[in-house]
Amino acid sequence: MKQRFRSLGCLARLSEYSESSLILRFFTRDLGAVSVLAKGIRRAQTRNQLMALGEYELNLYPPTESGLYLLGEISSVKERDLSASPQHWAAADCALELLSSLIIPTEESPVYYTLLDSYLDFLQTRKGSAILLWWRFLLRVFNFFGTPFDLLACSLCQATDESIAAWDRGTGALFCHNCLATSEY
């Protein structure tokens, strides 16, 4: 067998693969989004301990022709139970699903992992509207991608001293009074 690889990861999804195995989807600190084949885990007691959104230390074997990493060992680092609030659970799941779906270069995945980890920890401590925290997370992801979304600046002139007067539903652009008066909108 090849050399083991060790990383931290947040569990995004569990899927049954066979009578005794699972396919686990993680967002890891060092590799980004990975799918892991966990052979025999459904027979072991570990399956009851696996919880979505939890942080785990993983020992993985590199993928072979199947493209799935093979799970060597797994241990829980941090449990996150957001099941008491469906809004908080949905906001956490959306963030993890977003990062798992994006194509993130391997060298940048530690930055995104740190953002996700701090977001999930912060979400646990807050009461109230989770959608506001989700938007804050999304804006930070946009900034990391180099496309900041400034809610106080006009999309045409980039002025922040004028108040925003209109929003274009088609493009999402924000316009100040001056640009709205001179534009085709």
Regions found by a protein language model. Give the residues of each.
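Non-catalytic alpha-helical scaffolds and adjoining flexible linkers that form interface surfaces
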Residues: 1-23, 27-185
